[in-house]
């Protein structure tokens, strides 16, 4: 696999660190008044999901991670595995609970997700940035109840709970940002 110099570091670059594939989240080049320049890098370990901060000397090289990212459609969950399908080859890839992680609450059948494969096994599932889900449970919004403008909690069809504005009702479909878990808008049908 290719090696990357610290000058090539950027967000999203996949590197090997401590024998585990990692993704660079943030890279900051630091030039102190005295001494050698260095890079302060935040990396997310793709298997464990932990975010750690590492320091690399300027010019140091790091091994690139041999990972593959595929765009696959989510099919179904059989209780143990979440099954995804390649729309071109129709090959199915099962992912376990560890790979799916927090993405479970945003998975909707037929949505295209990004799977990260390492040594042929899925290690990370990333749902689409925005999903449209139906509200299955929420408190009724009472007229004039605007003392706390934070909205109200709503349970979605996947089991996820998000804060929504008071005017949103049960049965409505809303658009949610999966990166932050926040309500974006109502969806008109």
From Swiss-Prot:
May be beta-lysylated on the epsilon-amino group of Lys-34 by the combined action of EpmA and EpmB, and then hydroxylated on the C5 position of the same residue by EpmC (if this protein is present). Lysylation is critical for the stimulatory effect of EF-P on peptide-bond formation. The lysylation moiety may extend toward the peptidyltransferase center and stabilize the terminal 3-CCA end of the tRNA. Hydroxylation of the C5 position on Lys-34 may allow additional potential stabilizing hydrogen-bond interactions with the P-tRNA. Keywords: Cytoplasm, Elongation factor, Hydroxylation, Protein biosynthesis. It holds the Pfam family EFP. SMART domains: EFP, Elong-fact-P_C. The gene is efp. The modification N6-(3,6-diaminohexanoyl)-5-hydroxylysine is found at residue 34. Belongs to the elongation factor P family. One of its GO terms (cellular component) is cytoplasm. SUPFAM superfamilies: Nucleic acid-binding proteins, Translation proteins SH3-like domain. Involved in peptide bond synthesis. Alleviates ribosome stalling that occurs when 3 or more consecutive Pro residues or the sequence PPG is present in a protein, possibly by augmenting the peptidyl transferase activity of the ribosome. Modification of Lys-34 is required for alleviation. GO terms for molecular function: translation elongation factor activity. This is Elongation factor P. HAMAP family: EF_P (MF_00141). One of its GO terms (biological process) is peptide biosynthetic process. It is found in: Cytoplasm. InterPro entries: Elong-fact-P_C, NA-bd_OB-fold, Rib_uL2_dom2, Transl_elong_fac_P/YeiP, Transl_elong_KOW-like, Transl_elong_P/YeiP_cen, Transl_elong_P/YeiP_CS, Transl_elongation_fac_P. Pathway: Protein biosynthesis; polypeptide chain elongation.
């Amino acid at each position: 696999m290719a090696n990357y110099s610290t000058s090539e570091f950027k967000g999203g670059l996949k590197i090997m660190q401590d024998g585990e594939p990692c993704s660079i989240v943030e890279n900051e080049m630091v030039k102190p008044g005295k001494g050698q320049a260095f890079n302060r890098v935040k990396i997310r370990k793709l298997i464990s999901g932990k975010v750690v901060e590492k320091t690399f000397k300027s010019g140091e090289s790091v091994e690139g991670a041999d990972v593959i990212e595929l765009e696959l459609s989510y099919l179904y969950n059989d209780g143990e595995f979440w099954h995804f399908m390649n729309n071109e080859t129709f090959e199915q890839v099962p992912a376990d609970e560890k790979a799916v992680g927090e993405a479970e609450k945003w998975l909707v059948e037929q949505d295209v997700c990004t799977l990260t494969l390492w040594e042929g096994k899925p290690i990370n599932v990333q749902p689409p940035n925005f999903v449209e889900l139906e509200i299955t449970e929420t408190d009724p919004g009472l007229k004039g109840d605007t003392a706390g403008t934070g909205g109200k909690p709503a349970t979605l069809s996947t089991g996820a709970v998000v804060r929504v504005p008071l005017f949103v009702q049960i049965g409505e479909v809303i658009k949610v940002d999966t990166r932050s878990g926040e309500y974006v808008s109502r969806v008109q049908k």
